[in-house]
Amino acid sequence: MGRLMRGKVIYGTTLIGLFLFLFFYFWIPKHHIERIHHHRIKQVDAKSDLTGFKTHLPIISIDTKQQVIPLVTKEGGKYVKARDNINVDIELRDSPSRSHHLSEKPRIRTKGLISYRGNSSRYFDKKSLKVKFVTNKLKEKKHRLAGMPKESEWVLHGPFLDRTLLRNYLSYNIAGEIMSYAPNVRYCELFVNGEYQGVYLAVENIEQGEQRVPIEKSDKKLHKTPYIV
């Protein structure tokens, strides 16, 4: 009798789990109609006589124009925050479906504002960056990045502690399959002032936007505002 009851419990639990999976997968609306997984994109080897650095990943090149990226410092036992960002030049060689050479013509040349991202992680050898595309007059400018929808603000995450480079990539993509929105993500190679920084994750910054979190845009004239928890 006990074995029969145990079998019914297992059977019922399995059915409930299957129902919940189907409900979340088919009935919960997704903000992204079709999520593109970077590892599933077919790669085409770009035939070229160019020499030098070559990769099957998108290449992001940043020129700080001899400026030092601001970093929070400790003076007299107190943390002092430097200015938030610096104005830089950015080049994107970022088709996710073919290989790239560092010496090839970039798809996009644009101005940008960059700063370090994170608290304790900004002291790692491999630092994460927050990037905002702007015009020559430092006004917000939206660009596609590695096939992801147009936006101005992006995160270049340097997975310093995760030597597999898989943890955040898998987490974002699994979340994107079951949630209404999770940031899109692409692998990329990062160069700063011509020096190779390693493999990074280009990630959508979590913010209000048609292609990001679809909430009402805040009005500075009103006291109430939408927010993201």
Could you tell me what each predicted segment is?
Residues 2-229:
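Phosphate/dinucleotide-binding and metal-coordinating scaffold of catalytic cores
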